[in-house]
Structure formats: C-alpha cells, structure tokens
C-alpha cells in the first residue's frame, strides 16, 4: 500500500512504516511557543520537576502577540518567557530586537525544513506545511510534554487530496483558493485530516501564496496543510540558506506515492475563480467579490497583515494599487508587516512611502489587531476588510463588528473606495 507525504514523514520519525489511523510517538524537530501560550507551558514544565529541556536546539519562543507590551498584564506575561529563555540560554528566542509573527519569522530564519515534524502552541502552526513539513498546532500542556521529552504522541491523520487545476487570473491568490476550499468543506469538513495541495496550478503559486493556503487549513478543521517540495520551494530554501548562513538541518523530501490512499479528493479550477470574500461570521462564508460589490458594503477599516497575508508580496500588491491614491475619507487603513525583515524590505522598495502617503498607518510586526489584542480594535457596528484568517463574532473587537476576509488586492482597493470593490475594476 502506497503512502501520502504525511504518512512518510511519520514513518521516518517513528522508525517504522505507518498509515493513517495508527497512534505513534515521534521526536519533534521544532517546538514553537509565543508570548501568550509559552507561560502556560513553562508552568507545566516546572511543575513536572523538569530542570532541562530535552532538546534545547529544537525549542523556539517568538514574542509576537502583545509585543511591545500593550499593558502591565502583557508585560508581566512576556517577562515569564524572557526569564525562561535567558535561564536556558535558548538559541531560538526572538524578542523585540528581531521580531516577527512566528509563522512568518521561522521560515524566514531557515528554521523550517522539509520533512520536519513541527508543533506549536498556536493553531496556525499548520502554515509551515508549505515547505513540505508536517506542522500542527497543539495545546500548551502538549507543548510542555514536548519540552520535557523531546517528542509527542500523534494519531497519523488521513489525507484529503486537494487538486488545483488551471492558472489563476488577475488578482487571484492563494488566499482566494483557500477561502474557496473552506467554503466547499465547511469549518469542520477536514477535521483531523491533512490537506495535501496538488495539481498543475501549484507551479504557478509563489511561496507567499502557499504559506497563506497552509496557514488557513485549520479553518476547515484540518490537522495540517502540506505541499510537496518543488523548484519554487527549493529556490526559497536556497535564498533562506544564503541569508542565514545555512538552514537548521538538511531537508528530507518526501512525495506521495501514486497509489497512496486519500479519504477524499477535492478539485478546484482556479482559472474560473473570482476574488473570494468570506462574510461574517465564519471563514466558510465565502462569496465571489461580485456579490460583495452588489451588496454595497461600506467599510470603516482595512487591515493588511497577519501570519496569513503580511508578507512582502502582499505589501507589493497593496502599494501597486494604492500608488498616487488616498484611503477614503471615512475609512482607516492599518498595515502590519509580518516581520522586521519584511518591513525593511518594503522600506527599501519604497512601498512604505506609497502606503503612508495614501493614508495608511504602518505598525511594527505583531499579531495585534488580528486577534483583537490591540493596534486596530473595532468598535460597535464597525465593518473591516482584513487579510487575516478568522472572522468570528468579536474576533477583532466589539461583538457587533464585522470582518470580511479577503486578499490584499481586495483590501487595498476597498480602502481607496471606502467599500468592498473588485480590484480588477480599479
């Protein structure tokens, strides 16, 4: 019986051939915590009596949710992670001096490697599957178990094969593809499944698009999202190796067998996609942008950023649309680059000048507004177009506020118009 990529990764880490449904213990290649979830893991670690990390070089803490601290409580919470990192002399501790959103920063640093098993105490840890790794979110106590033992227990997930065909048209990106898939599957249609993205359309998708797609796999209930390594992945890894003096370890590349077993196959013709807008209050409420235009949805705020769409391509797209234009009078716009490197690259390319001159506010890298933390909270009844990943009730502020999830082109064009518009018509 053939195996999927996911089954092969688990087989290698378990030391035996395994298939979906089997329960195995495997060593973890990278454990990821942040300023919100790590203090809970640290408490469990210390209460267990553990004194040392099982594998110090496979543990990272990224300070990204409330950094710089928004209040006394978040400052004290951050202090716990800092003290632990200093005590254990963590190699991979990223604070304000080298900050970024964890799911953008770690790949950028060359710390995510094809063939890895990665866990993180954050649901969007599935992002890293874009590099051919098995990566999933877990609870803080599960993270503590990994810190103490160096491994964890898993049920090998079944895989849904997502076949993407055709070549996407103007202003159609990975964000639109994943929103369309979530519309098809629903928010629990891939529960505890791996979403394996395949098909000829993949070769036309940049790494930033792939990260967006795998990032939102969890919004369909998936355990992970994964894309096989190809020439685009390899070029990205070479670039990361050159920028960081090498990768953390050697890639171990896997491909699904032709006779691998899939629990479901979903085919999406990306050539016929319009930009997809996810209406409140679920990411599965996807509608074509033409419907949103017809609904004449005036907006109060636009937010471009997050671990989903705060990368350099997103800022390039927004700047191209907004050059020489202004944000609508009654609309606010916030731009949050996902890492300091992305921010500096955008400055170097002149993108920040364009966005600021258009009336956008540019913030430091942070999860901030996406989770309703700070730096862009919505008030009662306010409506926001966001390139983020969730639009639940109260996600970005007031319970009566509304979030419409979209790609960066839709967001930028809508900021200019003051209502949701089709960027292809700008």
Swiss-Prot record:
Entry-linked CDD domains: IPMI
Example GO biological process: L-leucine biosynthetic process
Entry keyword annotation includes S-adenosyl-L-methionine: no
GO terms, molecular function: 3-isopropylmalate dehydratase activity; 4 iron, 4 sulfur cluster binding; metal ion binding
Pathway where it operates: Amino-acid biosynthesis; L-leucine biosynthesis; L-leucine from 3-methyl-2-oxobutanoate: step 2/4
DNA damage is among the record's keywords: no
Binding residues annotated for [4Fe-4S] cluster, in chain numbering: 307, 367, 370
InterPro entries: Acnase/IPM_dHydase_lsu_aba_1/3, Acoase/IPM_deHydtase_lsu_aba, Aconitase_4Fe-4S_BS, Aconitase_4Fe-4S_dom, HAcnase/IPMdehydase_lsu_prok, Homoacnase/IPMdehydase_lsu, IPM_dehydratase_rel_enz, IPMI_cat
Cofactor: binding details: Binds 1 [4Fe-4S] cluster per subunit.
Top EC class of this enzyme: lyase
EC number annotated for this UniProt entry: 4.2.1.33
A Pfam family: Aconitase
Cofactor(s) it depends on: [4Fe-4S] cluster
Keyword entries, A-Z: 4Fe-4S, Amino-acid biosynthesis, Branched-chain amino acid biosynthesis, Iron, Iron-sulfur, Leucine biosynthesis, Lyase, Metal-binding
Catalytic reactions on record: (2R,3S)-3-isopropylmalate = (2S)-2-isopropylmalate
Family to which this protein belongs: Belongs to the aconitase/IPM isomerase family. LeuC type 2 subfamily.
Subunit structure: Heterodimer of LeuC and LeuD.
Job description of the protein: Catalyzes the isomerization between 2-isopropylmalate and 3-isopropylmalate, via the formation of 2-isopropylmaleate.
Protein name per the record: 3-isopropylmalate dehydratase large subunit
Species per Swiss-Prot/TrEMBL record: Sulfurovum sp. (strain NBC37-1)
Phylogenetic placement of the source organism: Bacteria, Pseudomonadati, Campylobacterota, Epsilonproteobacteria, Campylobacterales
């Amino acid at each position: 019986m053939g195996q999927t990529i996911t089954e092969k990764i688990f087989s290698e880490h378990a030391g035996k051939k395994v298939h979906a449904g089997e329960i195995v213990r495997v060593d973890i290649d990278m454990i990821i915590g942040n300023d919100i979830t790590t203090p809970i893991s640290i408490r469990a670690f210390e209460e267990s009596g553990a004194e040392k990390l099982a594998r110090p070089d496979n543990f990272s803490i990224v300070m990204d949710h409330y950094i710089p601290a928004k209040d006394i409580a978040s400052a004290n919470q951050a202090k716990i992670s800092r003290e632990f990192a200093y005590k254990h002399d963590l190699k991979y501790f990223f604070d304000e001096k080298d900050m970024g959103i964890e799911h953008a920063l770690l790949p950028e640093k060359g710390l995510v490697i094809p063939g890895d098993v990665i866990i993180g105490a954050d649901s969007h840890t599935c992002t890293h599957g874009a590099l051919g790794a098995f990566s999933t979110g877990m609870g803080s106590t599960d993270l503590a178990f990994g810190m103490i033992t160096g491994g964890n227990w898993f049920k090998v997930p079944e895989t849904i094969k997502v076949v993407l065909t055709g070549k996407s048209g103007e202003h159609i990106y990975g964000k639109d593809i994943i929103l369309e898939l979530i519309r098809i599957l629903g928010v629990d249609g891939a529960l505890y499944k791996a979403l394996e993205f395949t098909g000829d359309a993949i070769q036309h998708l940049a790494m930033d698009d792939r990260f967006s797609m795998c990032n939102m796999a969890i919004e369909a209930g998936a355990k992970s999202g994964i894309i096989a390594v190809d020439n685009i992945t390899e070029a990205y890894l070479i670039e990361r190796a050159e920028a960081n003096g090498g990768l953390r370890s050697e890639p171990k590349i896997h491909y699904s067998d032709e006779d691998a077993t899939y629990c479901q196959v979903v085919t999406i013709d990306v050539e016929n996609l319009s930009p997809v807008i996810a209406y409140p209050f679920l990411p599965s409420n996807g509608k074509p942008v033409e419907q949103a235009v017809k609904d004449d949805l005036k907006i109060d705020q636009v937010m471009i950023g997050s671990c989903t769409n705060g990368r350099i391509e997103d800022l390039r797209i927004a700047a191209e649309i907004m050059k020489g234009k202004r944000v609508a009078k009654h609309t606010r716009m916030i731009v949050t680059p996902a890492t300091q490197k992305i921010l500096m690259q955008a400055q170097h390319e002149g993108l920040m000048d364009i966005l600021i001159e258009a009336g956008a506010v540019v913030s430091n890298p942070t999860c901030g507004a996406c989770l309703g933390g700070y730096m862009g909270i919505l008030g009662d009844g306010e409506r926001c177009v966001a390139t983020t990943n969730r639009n639940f009730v109260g996600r970005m502020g007031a319970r009566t506020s509304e979030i419409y999830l979209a790609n960066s082109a839709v967001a930028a064009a809508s900021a200019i118009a003051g209502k949701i518009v089709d960027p292809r018509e700008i």
